[in-house]
Amino acid sequence: MSHFPWLTIIVVLPISAGSSIGFLPYRGNKAVRWYTICICILELLLTTYAFCYHFQLDDPLIQLEEDYNWINLFDFNWRLGIDGLSMGPVLLTGFITTLATLAAWPVTRDSRLFHFLMLAMYSGQIGSFSSRDLLLFFMMWELELIPIYLLLSLWGGKKRLYSATKFILYTAGGSIFLLMGVSGMGLYSSNEPTLNFETLTNQSYPVALEIIFYIGFFIAYAAKSPIIPLHTWLPDTHGEAHYSTCMLLAGILLKMGAYGLVRINMELLPHAHSIFSPWLMIIGAIQIIYAASTSPGQRNLKKRIAYSSVSHMGFITIGIGSITDTGLNGSILQIISHGFIGAALFFLAGTTYDRIRLVYLDEMGGIAILMPKMFMMFSSFSMASLALPGMSGFVAESVVFLGIITSPKYFLMPKILITFVMAIGMILTPIYSLSMSRQIFYGYKLFNVSNSYFVDSGPRELFILICILLPVIGIGIYPDFVLSLSVDKVEAILSSYFHR
């Protein structure tokens, strides 16, 4: 157990600092922007320092563990800890949130509330990934929903209230099942109710009850990830949200569902996961084909990118269902990879809209001539999204492929069928990705408009995009940079999984 409360500071700092925004002098928005960015940078530096100097990569056990009494009546403790499974998402959260704050620089209306909500969401997301208590996990899970709802409903597009309401109905509805599962697992004990992850890991349940718990948790994570058919809120939400909010949604929020699926369903409910893993593979394969087939029919640029996110989440679902070291590591790698790529694509879509004020692809064209820097960056991240070799998407999807092929749980024909479906999805991805680039950047529609003049990407925007592009290429060239964080923890999960 850590003697210094690193994780408590990391979790509490953003929302505490955000609460102080109201005390800043009213001298325009610049002070609020710089204050928020400095807090995000400080938080990221603290996280990096704590992990570099106080975390052992070869130790699969929980590290930097903290356990403080909170509510004795319910045996509810403030329990935090980090292992190889949660370290990557925590660092991703800090990185993407810092860049999203910088991306929100043009936001001037109610700037104080906007930046407070971003910092509050930061705390909720870090808390979710580092919680070691089921009730604390649920509280952090809910904490980040409120800021996102307000960011959508106050700073969104024309249909922002509809999309925000749809978002909260899906996610809050899923949270009801999450709360029921948390309550059921906590109360199922012969002695005292417990919500401690370590205790629950060694808890056994009747198969029927474990299946009920598994389904409840799965519905909550399926609504958040999203997994079909609970995905319909995502295109509407991305279509209306400000692009800085889209960066947080695509980069972090969607990954929380996949994280919960591994952390709780796979680690705490192994027998039920073994039963449902073939269905996860089937759902993931259908999701890849469905989203990749639906995406080309979307006229709205951000909705097309949103459907590509749904398709990529299918690879994560398949990797989790493969029940192999390789497949699960591939899913974790895809979580990190798509966090970068999705955030960058939505940032590019938003900055493009700021310039041309068009959202429909069939109205665009010829932007490459007018904005070559943006064209270069959009093309680079489109290549990363369609899994170009040398970029992170290719490595992640390839590792998931290997995980399915080497899985001892499935017969040869089901593995061939799933692999074939995934291959079709990988063929469809370049179709909608490259056609999207063609519709935006090629042709002469905007170039022939009288008095057409558009400003190319500025230094701030290029800085954000380069900061995201570097890890995408870095992971593509040296994937061990991410895999080294999780490989020992994945082995520990699966070794205990098969021997229980």
Curated annotation (Swiss-Prot):
Record's keyword terms, sorted: Chloroplast, Membrane, NAD, NADP, Plastid, Plastoquinone, Quinone, Thylakoid, Translocase, Transmembrane, Transmembrane helix
Similarity field: Belongs to the complex I subunit 4 family.
GO MF entries: NADH dehydrogenase (ubiquinone) activity; ubiquinone binding
Alphabetical GO biological process terms: ATP synthesis coupled electron transport; electron transport coupled proton transport
Protein name, entry field: NAD(P)H-quinone oxidoreductase chain 4, chloroplastic
Reactions it catalyzes: a plastoquinone + NADH + (n+1) H(+)(in) = a plastoquinol + NAD(+) + n H(+)(out); a plastoquinone + NADPH + (n+1) H(+)(in) = a plastoquinol + NADP(+) + n H(+)(out)
Species name: Illicium oligandrum
Organism domain of life: Eukaryota
Keyword Transmembrane: yes
Taxonomy of the source species: Eukaryota, Viridiplantae, Streptophyta, Embryophyta, Tracheophyta
Intracellular or extracellular location(s): Plastid, Chloroplast thylakoid membrane
This protein's GO CC annotations: chloroplast thylakoid membrane
